[in-house]
Design a protein with these regions (language model features):
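Charged catalytic carboxylate motif
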Residues: 13, 114, 140
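GNAT-family acyltransferases
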Residues: 1-96, 160-178
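Glycine-/small-residue-rich active-site loops that bind phosphorylated ligands and cofactors
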Residues: 74, 89, 106-107, 137
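Conserved catalytic-core motifs of GNAT/GCN5-like acyltransferases
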Residues: 133, 146-165
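Conserved beta-strand-loop-alpha-helix junction that forms the acyl-donor binding cleft
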Residues: 132-142
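Conserved GNAT acetyl-CoA-binding A-motif
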Residues: 122-133
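Conserved acetyl-CoA-binding loop-helix of GNAT-fold acetyltransferases
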Residues: 98-101, 107-120, 124, 143-147
Length: 178
């Protein structure tokens, strides 16, 4: 498995991933998979700008969106968004990382592998402490975070939803090498 940034030849796979979330009437997670883009070309430009910190909306921090693929396929299994640093809002509930696996590929261990690969990217970016949050009722996501060294700091209530805040420090990055 590997994380990639999309190029022009991934248009159909990108559309397929988005379509699967829509068919299942699910919120597209992470938001950066599509953002506010109407087209794939617009997505590619926005992703590049986000990575460089260009033309960001107020309150948005630079981020990199990666997609999980197997080593021998272009099929997009999931996506993970790495935010370069935390602002006040992200420190409270958004965290450094947001991720999602397409509905048909869940419960196969992909999220755990994807997060482990993303933590390696964080290491390359010299992000030494990672905050990841999830809803308390999202037990699968909590397990993914814990398997990758996440330590629960606390729980907060946001818009009536209990969110758990986990920290992973650089010395914990190599916990899961799945």
């Amino acid at each position: 498995m590997k994380l990639i940034k999309l190029t022009e030849n991934y248009k159909n796979e990108w559309e397929s991933l988005i379509n699967e979330f829509e068919i299942n009437q699910e919120k597209l997670i992470p938001f950066g998979v599509k953002g506010n883009c109407e087209s794939f070309l617009e997505f590619l430009i926005e992703s590049e700008n986000n990575s460089k910190g260009l033309d960001l909306a107020r309150g948005i921090v630079p981020s990199d969106i990666y997609f999980l693929v197997s080593n021998d396929s272009d099929y997009l299994i999931g996506a993970i968004d790495i935010r370069h640093y935390l602002n006040e809002g992200l420190l409270k509930s958004g965290g450094n990382i947001g991720y999602g696996i397409r509905p048909s590929e869940r419960n196969k261990g992909y999220a755990t592998q994807m997060l482990a690969l993303a933590l390696e990217k964080c290491k390359e970016m010299q992000i030494s402490k990672i905050l990841i949050t999830c809803s308390k009722d999202n037990i699968a996501s909590a397990n993914v975070i814990i398997k990758n060294g996440g330590i629960l700091e606390n729980e907060i209530i946001e818009n009536g939803i209990v969110k758990q805040r986990y920290w992973i420090s650089r010395d914990m990055f190599n916990i899961n090498k799945g």
